[in-house]
Amino acid sequence: MNPSSAGEIADYLKHGDYSLAVRRTLDYCLDTGDDALIDNAVNWSREYHVNENSKSVKPIPDNFISEAESILQQASKIQSGISYQTKPLISAEKISKTYSGGGFSLKPINVSVNTGNVLGVVGENGNGKTTLLRCLAGQLALDDGEIKYHLLQKPDPYAVKNHIAFIPQRILKWFGLLKDNLHFSASIAGVYGEKNNLMVNFMLERLNLTSYAHLTWNQISSGYRTRFEIARILLQKPRLLILDEPLANLDINAQQTILTDLIFMAKGAHNPMGIILSSQQLHEVEKVADTVIFIKQGDCLYSSNDRSEKITSNAVEFETTVTRETIIAIFGEQKIELQFNGGFYTIISPALSAQEIIGKMITAEISITYFRDITYSTKRFF
């Protein structure tokens, strides 16, 4: 983050976006590296969450705004000298993998990720998303191609494992209290004593997990297990975070919160990192990813990096109660392709823009309950 971010946080506070303001203030203070300021922000955040969980009639604790202003003022003075540059993290060139028996093969594929960037990998189950992620994480040997880990001078398996964190869809069970596991994870990363306590408390607050820290694995839902696993991994400060279907066990609100939080932290000066994630939640991933690739039967059919080369028509997905014949009549002689999957219609046109397609239907005064421009969305390939 940079000093201008203090103004963004002030706007969140002004307009009542308190949860986002708290999360971003914690990020802002973490980037300063000032332990006393971080601790102050953690305590301020804790008061906010206690008030929120108590279902108080007051949306925020007393002195919440004045304390926030004081914290931001202190952080801004330190932040003025902090900056980081985006660096290449990983690049894979024509990597491929075939499992023994020849049942499935990942076709040659190219990907690259820099610090602060997010790569989204989408596709149906069983089409190669997990295989690709495990290859990039160094968990599977390649049949062909090359992976370069740009920040490692000697990318041996041990160095790669410490450089990259991989969170699978099925997370292994934790034993003991959740908070104790986080303390242990921080100690593995060389964080001890008061600094260990500070960073664990910070991560609990940052992901809003403090009220669950005293529980055990069997006492929390699958969604919270995912969030605790993310907290555990982030304490180890990986340079590349790879997540396999992290949204599968989360509700809609938690999905977007986790994604935006990961992006915020990936771009922070404390530990700028790259993120690669797989998912079937296309809309959520496309909103946050810098690059999205679509994999089908082991082959990369689409990458948003070269979308202009493959997309020659515009497409709009929408929901309406009118008939197919009514829709066709609206466009008259203009050439369109109309598809219906039982729930949504899709209009594809090489001549009309998405705005023109929607405009014609609005002018015709037909009822539209949902629409989305999917011209450059991987939704077109499902």
Mark where each language-model region is.
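Helix-to-loop junction immediately C-terminal to a conserved catalytic motif
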Residues: 137
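Conserved ABC ATPase "signature" region
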Residues: 82, 183, 195-212
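Q-loop/switch helix immediately C-terminal to the Walker
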Residues: 170, 176-190
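ABC transporter nucleotide-binding domain
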Residues: 264-275, 280-345
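The feature captures the beta-strand-to-loop junction immediately N-terminal to the Walker
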Residues: 122-124
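Conserved ABC transporter NBD signature motif
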Residues: 145-160
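Catalytic Walker B motif of ABC-type/P-loop ATPase nucleotide-binding domains
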Residues: 241-245
